[in-house]
């Protein structure tokens, strides 16, 4: 948090004087015993705040981490969170929101901030919705305008072509698909924007839990396709927001 923002939060009563002194005295991170070293300086250093990977964390650790952000009135996103984990956090911090399908907890103090640019999130099938939601919620949390285009896979390519003019207006496109994952390549052949491809684990046996989709996207014959890890909607959205932010700044 920069000093100007800190002063404004003190004046508005969002944080106490003691909490402000703690922020001024810290080294950019907060050591929570044996649990975590929270990187509060990450937003200043990288442009976006730290994220919490919830899946492998015990309840006590997860609550302590979210509580540290809450006490500073800092926004944070938690990925791969179960409904039970959300309920545990919600008991302590009432301000958190949750998407059960997207498996994301958000503590967002910047909901009303103006969004910038435009990211198109294009997913092949309804089964890809959890990954699509993870990407959508993350991108909105990180400050981007987002438009979603769902169930427009190549098995019914007319559905994609019907939306292609809208998709072309975006600064960057996230393409999400399982099975043979042809969507990213088809899109790349139709637009002049960079594409971040997300292979999903959706598919029958030879899909190999998303490996087939991953290799298909990596081997795309169309230029301009970069690929993130299997089911990694968060990672795709983060990268897309970095690019979107640069484009939005350049257009001013």
For the regions a language model picked out, list residue spans one by one.
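Glycine-rich phosphate/diphosphate-binding loop of Rossmann-like nucleotide-binding domains
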Residues: 116-156
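C-terminal binding/interaction regions
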Residues: 123, 127, 165-168, 172, ...
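Short glycine-rich or small-residue beta-strand-to-loop segments that form or flank ligand, phosphate
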Residues: 49-52, 76, 118-124, 173-175, ...
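Glycine-rich oxoanion-binding loops at beta->alpha junctions
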Residues: 104-106, 145-166, 211-212, 228
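Long amphipathic alpha-helical segments
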Residues: 1-82, 86-87, 91-92, 96
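Short glycine/serine/threonine-rich phosphate/pyrophosphate-binding segments
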Residues: 60-62, 128-133, 157, 177-187, ...
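Glycine-rich phosphate-binding loop
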Residues: 162-200
